[in-house]
Amino acid sequence: MSRALDAECTAQKDPRNQKRYKVSSCDRISTQEGQYIYKAQLIVDEGEDPHFTDGVSFIFLTKEAPYSCEVVEFDYANAILFFSSTKLIFVTSDCRVISDATMNTIALKKLLEELSEYNINKSYPLYKFLEGSTDKLKDIKHPPYPSYLEKYFVKDKSQFSAFKASLDKDITFIWGPPGTGKSYTLAAIIMALHSMPGERTAVCCLSNVAVDQLLSKVVKNITVEEPEMKRGEFYRAGRTQDELLLRTDFLFPDDAISSKIRLMIKLYNKKLEGYRTANQQFSNEAIEIKAHLKDAREELKEHTDYLINKVRVVFSTISNFVINPRLKDGLFDNLIVDEASMLAMPQLIALARNVSKRIILVGDFQQLSPITVAGIPVLKNNVFKLCGIDINHTNHPALRPLLNQRRSHPKLVEIINKPFYGGHLMTDNPKYNSIVARPPYSECVVGMCSVTEGMVRFTKGGTRQNFANSEAVMHLLDLYNENEEDTFSIGVITPYTGQVSLLKALFSKREYSTDFQDRVKIGTVHTFQGSESDVIIFDMVDCSKFEKGKPYFGKIYANEQGEQLLNVAISRARHKLIVVCDPEYLKTSPGGSISDRSISIFNTLLKAQWTKI
């Protein structure tokens, strides 16, 4: 595994895989308490879709030296990056901003190398993953869980089966197809494990957003079932931006310092909301407040991190777990990992090496697999597959499938049910939603927006764009924006970063209200895994005409990866799916690498109502 991680690190350092942006200008806008705030104008090549998340580290490279910096804010429409540095930067010509993806890989490799110095305890559940014996389950004795949890599963036996197995066995795989209540079931499992005397549980997710979403469900349960929950039982490691969680007293110690920091965060957020309402969120004053807010969140994290070794349940991202000494060296009885279909074996070893009783892995192996640049099997195969679990092998004794789909309209479930889940999903969402009745595509759950005059062009970075498709998407958004009474969410999904960049550029030029902007999310399929929207607009991009050369489907649609992509894109929709594509191109499916399963999905979509625009 060490060699595989070395190869991954080398691939990540390759300039072709790094995110590097030239800087046309950089100005210092503020100096506060030994911290400098800068405003950099980036040169973003056509088709690039830069991502800069608040608080994330990056390298600002000048001719003189590299500087470690942190993101304060990013103005996507104008490609302006606001950032902080503890050092005064001597700006030179030919500066660059570099996103360094190797930090987590290096930390993971170092941790695994430390592990090689001693043997993992053979009584720990992780050992079974290493020797390939996860089918040999061990019974875990435990006291009764709170009786109120029984009512959570009155209507769903598959959820109760997963709940019981998670408590009774040392290893549990919970297979949760879209909309079957993974988070709902997990929240109950977490409550039950918390009730076990003396046991400590680590809960890990891929992203901060996912951590906050799951913790919010647990907090909601606690508010109803155990309103007198004392402090020091649950802790959210890392930095949260969720205001509800920041207001939840039992997640924080009862001391003057943390109370003061939380109050400051609340005040900063209130001020920033005022700037945003006035459309001045990128003013120098707002950026200074945002920098203070970032520092306050970091201060709160550092002040409260000691709780990791004291609380019963810790929530964290996977990357934070690997890097944070208190987490990676901590002793836990139980480990829960959400979205485990994107978890490879090296990450599991890092998370589970000190877990003594239970490993509970939750995810859908029919969705996206681990992200890797090097493409080495041990890094790209998820833990389900490495344990012999896939759609053709679902009889593993530790596997507990969730079968009742309650999120999406039955007609949407029909599209993915047979191809991806063998027809085992049962729909339990008969409620008619008014979104279906409204235009565009009134009374249609699935609509096909036919774009026959499109043309695929390749950007400098090799990604794809289709301007006609993007205009069709914007026309659909314009229609939804016209109805001011609507409050539902809209997701725009596309496989290519080049098309995301184009769509975001067009979206930023529209004079949509702040409320409508907040309700629309535009991104690649990967950015949507684990999320959902009332309406999904799926822009397929590929069509029968290329700017140069013979048309062919992009490799992202190929083979198993293409199947997973289609499954995720379609299953994000709760009530309505609109596919923007060239229907004739779907019928021919050129390229030779499109699987029969993907073609069957195309044929199902082609049966939907469509109109030319």
Locations of regions flagged by a protein language model:
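Pre-ATPase regulatory/linker segments immediately N-terminal to the P-loop/RecA-like helicase/translocase core
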Residues: 23-161, 231, 242-274, 578, ...
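Core residues of folded domains in eukaryotic genome-function proteins
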Residues: 36-38, 54-56, 65-67, 77-79, ...
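Beta-strand cores of modular interaction/reader domains in eukaryotic scaffold and signaling proteins
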Residues: 59, 70, 82, 173, ...
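Residue-level recognition of conserved beta-strand edge/terminus positions
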Residues: 59-63, 317, 539
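Conserved helicase motor core of SF1/SF2 NTP-dependent helicases
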Residues: 196, 319-613
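Conserved P-loop NTPase mechanochemical-coupling segment
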Residues: 271-313
